[in-house]
């Protein structure tokens, strides 16, 4: 019996020692801090979205071929007067007829990217709990106009916006090696700059962003977003070539509703049939 008591007492002592050890470990862990898995969501429906895409080599090569054809055409249409910078600009019309290996045309590829931009902007306007409501929306896109910008050393484009469209784009096909800026602390030469609506005194947002373009960079942005292009210097006669286009979009369901309303209005405005008119009119041309 005495031996049994000793065994039980020894067991209790061990259990108490283990409990104290566990308590000390818990206190130590609490002192270090506890890691939690939390769910976070950034909500910014009021922000203009600037999307940057890296174009596949096949699209870059296709666009170079298309723009070479246009720039070498002596009968090309010069749109230079339509731009504030008066740079050489040309109408772009060959994308629809240039097919790519993945299927479809260069035009369809670019408009699909535009569609993805619209989709992401739509998601940004909704909180996560409403994503299911907007995920099924189908968008129709339309390219309003397209042009080439062929710039050389010293040429630039001052701050401007695009009109008569909802969004704009720019893709870079040729980018020369720029010489170092005359102000190393401000390496802006050759940059494209976007100017948003962020407050200049805000420490949590920026109202200006600059990017030194590389071949294949493709930007999509709201047409009202101000932007400009800085001049550049090179050690030779090298071209910076980009292609831009303006686009618009509409919810497919809304478009179909508009078409239906237009048809109804046309039917209502059509003149009523003449009462008592003969089914067949015979014209006698005999003298």
Q: PLM features: what roles do these ranges have?
A:
Residues 200-287:
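Catalytic core of Fe(II)/2-oxoglutarate
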Residues 29-136, 154-157:
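Non-heme Fe(II)/2-oxoglutarate
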Residues 140-220, 230, 237, 246, ...:
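Catalytic core of non-heme Fe(II) oxygenases with the double-stranded beta-helix
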Residues 11-27:
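Short acidic, low-complexity intrinsically disordered linear motifs used
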Residues 46-50, 166-168, 240:
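Short hydrophobic/aromatic beta-strand or adjacent loop that forms the aromatic wall/cage
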Residues 123, 127, 178-182, 256:
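Short, solvent-exposed secondary-structure capping/transition elements
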Residues 2-5, 16:
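N-terminal acidic, proline/glycine-rich, low-complexity intrinsically disordered segments
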């Amino acid at each position: 019996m005495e031996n049994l008591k000793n065994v039980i007492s020894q067991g209790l002592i061990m259990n108490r020692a283990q409990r104290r050890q566990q308590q000390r470990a818990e206190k130590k862990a609490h002192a270090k801090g506890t890691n939690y898995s939390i769910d976070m969501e950034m909500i910014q429906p009021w922000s203009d979205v600037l999307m940057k895409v890296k174009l596949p080599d096949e699209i870059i090569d296709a666009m170079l071929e298309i723009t070479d054809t246009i720039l070498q055409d002596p009968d090309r249409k010069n749109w230079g007067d339509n731009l504030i910078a008066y740079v050489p600009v040309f109408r772009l019309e060959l994308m629809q007829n240039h097919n790519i290996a993945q299927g479809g045309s260069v035009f369809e590829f670019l408009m699909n990217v535009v569609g993805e931009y619209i989709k992401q902007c739509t998601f940004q306007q909704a909180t996560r709990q409403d994503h299911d409501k907007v995920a099924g929306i189908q968008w129709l896109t339309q390219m309003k106009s397209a042009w080439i910008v062929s710039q050389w050393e010293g040429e630039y484009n001052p701050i401007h916006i695009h009109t008569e469209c909802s969004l704009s784009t720019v893709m870079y096909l040729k980018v020369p090696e720029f010489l170092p800026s005359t102000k190393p602390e401000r390496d802006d030469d050759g940059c494209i700059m976007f100017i948003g609506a962020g407050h200049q005194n805000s420490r949590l947002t920026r109202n200006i962003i600059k990017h030194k373009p590389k071949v294949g960079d493709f930007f999509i942005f709201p047409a009202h977003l101000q932007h400009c292009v800085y001049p550049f210097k090179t050690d030779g006669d090298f071209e910076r070539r980009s292609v831009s286009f303006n686009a618009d979009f509409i919810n497919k369901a809304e478009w179909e509703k508009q078409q239906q309303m237009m048809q109804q209005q046309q039917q209502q405005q059509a003149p009523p049939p003449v009462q008592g008119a003969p089914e067949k009119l015979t014209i006698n041309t005999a003298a």
